[in-house]
């Protein structure tokens, strides 16, 4: 019993640790920004002095670096990281690890995370099932073939273009106000549950229809580079919210020289303009 009690105390008081590996050689520098609570984090594998909330340049003494401390915000943007271990960093609320060489990212222990920026890596999967507080997600320019957002009901901004998504279920993300899912392989996009949506960028997919009748707050729509034509393009423009007596909305339905399957007739343009939308074709 005593041994068990000691074990529990040890675990509950465990320090928060971030570990990363970089392809940069020893002697080169990395630029990091950290916000932390309490004492300055302890560093191994690099020299420098952390200053909370400020970008600091560190010199590598090893290609594997360990940061021990209560770091709540960690920005390691563009440092040639090949691995990032956050499984012992429970205090983290915001992570910026974009423009690196990460092939995996385990966030299962970062339950306090509200903002995630992991674009321009080599991620093939992203498990966000434990990150229920997540409100801002930027994961563009990876190799994601699936993205399960069913546990992320607090999500407000989603930026996931330039992946390999064939399906995107947004039915659980009713707080969503901005969505960019362009340059994927989507054939269907249902935004009927996203009534707070103000911006939708879904260009460069394979959509044949788009119903916006529930999106009364929408002000900005880019849907060029799809396959919406005939009766479906007419249904789309008729479903646009009426912005009469409001700031004009912006609707980009055709854009050259992008491969274009949309067909928008003058009569369709007139319908959109009649609802105070600026139409770019």
Language model features with spans:
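Conserved hydrophobic beta-strand positions in leucine-rich repeat
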Residues: 74, 95-97, 116-118, 137-139, ...
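N-terminal capping/linker segments that flank leucine-rich repeat
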Residues: 1-90, 109-111, 130, 151, ...
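Canonical leucine-rich repeat
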Residues: 84, 105, 126, 147, ...
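Conserved hydrophobic position(s) of the canonical leucine-rich repeat
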Residues: 71, 81, 92, 102, ...
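Tandem repeat scaffolds
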Residues: 135, 177-180, 191-193, 198-199, ...
């Amino acid at each position: 019993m005593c041994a068990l009690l000691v074990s529990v105390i040890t675990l509950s008081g465990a320090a928060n640790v971030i570990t990363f590996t970089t392809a940069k050689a020893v002697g080169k520098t990395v630029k990091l920004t950290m916000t932390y609570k309490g004492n300055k984090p302890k560093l191994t594998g690099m020299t420098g002095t952390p200053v909370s909330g400020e970008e600091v340049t560190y010199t590598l003494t090893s290609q594997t670096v360990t940061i021990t401390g209560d770091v709540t915000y960690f920005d390691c943007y563009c440092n040639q990281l090949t691995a990032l271990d956050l499984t012992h960093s429970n205090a983290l609320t915001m992570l910026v690890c974009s423009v690196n060489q990460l092939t995996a990212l385990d966030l299962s222990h970062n339950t306090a995370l509200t903002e995630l920026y992991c674009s321009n890596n080599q991620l093939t999967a992203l498990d966000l099932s434990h990150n229920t507080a997540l409100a801002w997600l930027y994961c563009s320019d990876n190799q994601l073939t699936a993205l399960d957002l069913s546990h992320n009901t607090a999500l407000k901004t989603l930026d996931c273009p330039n992946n390999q998504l064939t399906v995107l279920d947004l039915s659980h993300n009713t707080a969503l106000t901005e969505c960019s899912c362009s340059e994927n392989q989507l054939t269907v996009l249902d935004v009927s549950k996203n009534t707070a949506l103000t911006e939708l960028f879904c260009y460069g997919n394979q959509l044949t229809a788009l119903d916006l009748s529930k999106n009364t707050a929408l002000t900005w729509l880019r849907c060029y580079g799809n396959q919406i034509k005939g009766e479906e393009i007419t249904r789309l423009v008729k479903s646009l919210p009426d912005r009469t007596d409001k700031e004009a909305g912006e609707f980009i339905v055709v854009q050259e020289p992008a491969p274009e399957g949309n067909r928008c007739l003058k009569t369709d343009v007139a319908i959109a303009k009649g609802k105070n939308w600026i139409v770019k074709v």
